[in-house]
Regions:
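Well-ordered beta-strand positions in beta-sheet-rich domains
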Residues: 108-112
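Conserved N-terminal/central alpha/beta ligand/cofactor-binding core
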Residues: 1-102, 107, 119, 123-136, ...
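A short acidic, glycine-rich active-site loop
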Residues: 136-145
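Acidic, metal-coordinating catalytic segment for phosphate/diphosphate chemistry
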Residues: 153
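Amphipathic alpha-helical segments in well-structured domains
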Residues: 64, 146-149
C-alpha cells in the first residue's frame, strides 16, 4: 500500500526495494520512538488519532530532543552540539571520521569513528521555498539543508542512490 502510494506520488520514479524496506521497518521505529517518549496522540479508546487516512498526529517537535537524550544514555557515544562537519576523514577507501568546527568557539575538531553514517536530512535548502516574503523559510524542511553531507560523501567516494526519491512520512 505504501509502496504503491509513494510510487504514484513520484510518478513511478522510485526504487521499490528501498520503499518496501522503509515501510517494513516504519512501525518498529515509531514504536521505539513512542517508548522513548514521543507523544503520539490517541483518542479516548486508545486508538491513534489520524490526520487523513495515512497520517498519525504526533508532537513531532519533540523528536530531536528525545533522540538526543537517548543518544546521551548510550555507552561510548559523545554528542558535540553546535559543531559543523566540514569534511570526512578518509584513509584509503574508508571514511574513518570527520573534521568539524565549533560554531560558537571556532574550535577545530578531529573526530575518529569506526563507522560513519551520512544522515544530513536532505537538500531542501537548495530549492526556492513556496512561501513568499518574510515567510520564506516557514516550511517543513530547514533551509540550511543544502546537501553538504551528500557532497562530502560523494567526494569521499561513497555510493549514493535515489536522489530523485522524495521521502513521504506516512504511517
Amino acid at each position: 500500500d505504501y509502496v504503491d502510494y509513494a510510487k504514484k506520488d513520484a510518478d513511478g520514479i522510485v526504487r521499490e526495494d528501498l520503499l518496501l524496506t522503509m515501510s517494513e521497518k516504519l512501525n518498529e521505529v515509531v514504536d521505539r520512538l513512542e517508548k522513548l517518549g514521543l507523544v503520539i496522540l490517541k483518542d479516548e479508546n486508545g486508538k491513534y488519532v489520524t490526520r487523513g487516512n495515512r497520517n498519525l498526529k504526533i508532537n513531532g517537535e519533540n523528536i530531536k530532543p528525545i533522540l538526543a537524550e537517548a543518544a546521551l544514555q548510550k555507552e561510548n557515544v559523545s554528542v558535540l552540539n553546535r559543531v559543523n562537519i566540514i569534511d570526512y576523514a578518509v584513509e584509503g577507501n574508508r571514511i574513518k571520521g570527520a573534521y568539524g568546527i565549533g560554531i560558537e568557539n571556532d574550535t577545530f575538531y578531529i573526530i575518529e569513528a569506526k563507522a560513519v553514517i551520512i544522515a544530513t536530512g536532505g537538500a531542501a535548502g537548495l530549492y526556492k521555498p513556496n512561501n513568499p516574503g518574510f515567510s520564506r523559510h516557514k516550511m517543513w524542511y530547514p533551509p540550511f539543508n543544502t546537501g553538504a553531507g551528500y557532497a562530502m560523501g560523494i567526494k569521499a567516494g561513497a555510493e549514493m542512490t535515489t536522489f530523485e526519491m522524495r521521502f513521504i512520512a506516512l504511517r
